[in-house]
Amino acid sequence: LVNLLLSAETLQTLAREEPETVSAMAEAVAAGRAAVIGGELCERPLPLLPPEVIADQLRQGVEVYQEILGTRPKVFGRRRFGLTPLLPQLLKSQGFQGCLHFTLDDGRFPTGNQSRIRWQGLDGSTLEALARVPTDGSSAETFLRLPERLGDVLDLDHSATMIFAHWPGQASPWYRDLQRLASFGPVLGTFVSIAQQFEHSGSTGQAVEYAADQYRSPYLRQAVAARQRDPLSRWRRFGHRWATLQALQTFRTLASVVTGSPWTRADVEALRRQIESALECDADDTSELDQSLNEAAQAAARDLAAALGSASAEGSGRLALNPACWSRKWLIARQTAEGAEGVPTGAAAPEARSATVDVPGLGFAWHSPEPPAAQPGARRSWWSRSKKSAPPMAEGNVLRNEFFEITFDPTTGAIRSMVDFAGRGNRLAQQIALRTSESDTLPEDWDGAPTTRTWYSIMAAEALEVVTPGPDYGEIRVRGRLCDPYGRRVAGFVQTTRLERGSRLLDLHIELDPEMQPDPEPWKSYYCARFAWDDESAELRRGLHGVARPASSTCLESTQFVEIRSGSASTAILTDGLPYHRRQGYRMLDTLLIVQGETARRFRLGVGFDLPHLPAAAQDFLTPQFVLPGASQPPSSTGWLFHLDARNVIASDWQPVVESGQVVGFRVALLETEGRRATMSLRCFRTPGRAWKLAATAEAQTELPIEEDRVRVPIGPYEYSRIECRW
């Protein structure tokens, strides 16, 4: 018996280059002499990807196995590191019966003394898993120590199992001898396929749930060691591209369900493949992909506007379209005296007032550029006091709005304090720094060995200026340099800090001009944005696949956010797609900006104070604004097409259901983000006829109740599911 661990992409390559080998493989699988382990189209870095990408990779992979081999793998496995607590529910939804809870690459994952476990995922679903780390089938040492290993397994394991792994054609001759011995009798055991092991051996019966911090990927260290280009910013680009692609798909689906005309998925699928492939390549210029993606998203927005009855280029207003399932507030500039229009970018004059437009989730809002007519005020008595004017939002080294106040250090340019008006004490401080180590300039210690010391650079401000004092937003820009402990310049920096009126989100734009490059060890030498807080007992949480999970490790991974929770106060760092963060002690966190091989020099971060729904805010930080200029007013100035009444549920991956060339319904993915069970209502602009939760088989699908224009959907904690609704 042979167990073949290979991805669908590898199988496609074999079918193209070695068709005879694949034909023999298919015959062996059909005859039961071989079993295939796999599942994905290709081995992507799963812990950093959104659930939609992982589910799509599994779906495409299963289709490839079925097409080439005539069967699909029942057990999921991969060589490269990629274990994450989200996998059990996604694998069960795709019809997998078991998985390998180990990888043959670098990285860290939890192990135990049992070869068979019931792996429990984020949502509580369980999947049978094989957790025994394989031994090297090509090494003679494995067989010299075989009696000892067999004794340990028989002593501790509920179902005694040993796993041998080797590259094709590289097995030890002793491994072949062991197979011959086993063919005469089961004295030393019986060789079985992975599928047979799951069928014949019993489970331990107890579900095992591992924390997210027990898994640590080797992606950053591997990327720097392989001299890959942009090991950090490629994830930022992916986050923005994926958010734009989701907006494009949502707009097209909304337009389709309104007009009844389907749209072709070929160009969207091509863009999706390019976005995912860009994670693995070192292309110097990806502007063509960004241009194609942005043009397609704008075209989809115009199609939706036309479906809503708003003709573009025929009116004087603007139509704001929201692809997210939550409402969004945007700052849109009114027409100035010179007739200029547009969303302010920081260069607008203080007198160019803006309007805050509230756009419903999965809806639209039309905005007139003309300021509202002045209302006649009440006659003021001679003894009444004149209204005290509000202080400017930015003055000197202070930036403020209704909720909090930011104070800059005039000497260093760092943010000295972020003070919440509703509480007491400093919530957060921030600075830019280079972290590195040196040993050649330091004296020897007492035993004669050279001393290595890790140090952080020091900020020195050269200019601190108020760019915009208000009244709609304030902006302060700091220019300066970073110096080593001896005063030598190592980099230049520009940080622009922006705060809008009525917002709980602080926007940081950072530009770096490094003169000293980081060392090859990326987790120990880097340029970073460093944050500090005063509560040593504060709990850290990080975004993982769109949900918040506790974070206690030193090295953290999150492309969405890191939350600092102290009592009832929540301070969140929105990472804008930057994935790697290092905790220093109990009160400091470094968000990595530049490591060796990184070419990006401009970065954006956000700091949110008591944001009500953090996963949605993090996704909103990545999603672009869609405002169509010159749009005529639709029949209704504002409205929505779909509405979710549960704020802890995020809808994504909208697709139309097409039959006989007509749109007869839609599909959507739902993710519960806060660990709370709920029965939510999905309201539709048109009365639905039938709806159900999708599953791996038709028998496992669940019919959903419908009440007028509402589809009632029960959803569990951290559950990711897909529903289908037909008119």
PLM feature spans:
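CE4/NodB-like, metal-dependent polysaccharide N-deacetylase domain
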Residues: 52-93, 145-163
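Catalytic grooves of carbohydrate-active enzymes
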Residues: 124-312, 323, 484-485, 568-633, ...
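Catalytic domains of cell-wall/extracellular-matrix polysaccharide-remodeling enzymes
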Residues: 67-113, 173-177, 508
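N-terminal catalytic cores of secreted or lumenal carbohydrate-active enzymes
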Residues: 1-49, 53-56, 64-65, 96, ...
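The substrate-binding groove and active-site-proximal loops of carbohydrate-active enzymes
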Residues: 5-15, 39-55, 70-81, 102-105, ...
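Loop/turn elements at helix/coil->beta-strand transitions in domains of secreted/extracellular proteins
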Residues: 2, 31-35, 69-73, 94-98, ...
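Acidic, His- and aromatic-enriched active-site or binding-groove loops in soluble protein domains
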Residues: 20-39, 88, 92-110, 118-125
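C-terminal (or distal) subdomains of carbohydrate-active enzymes
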Residues: 87-93, 106, 115-116, 174, ...
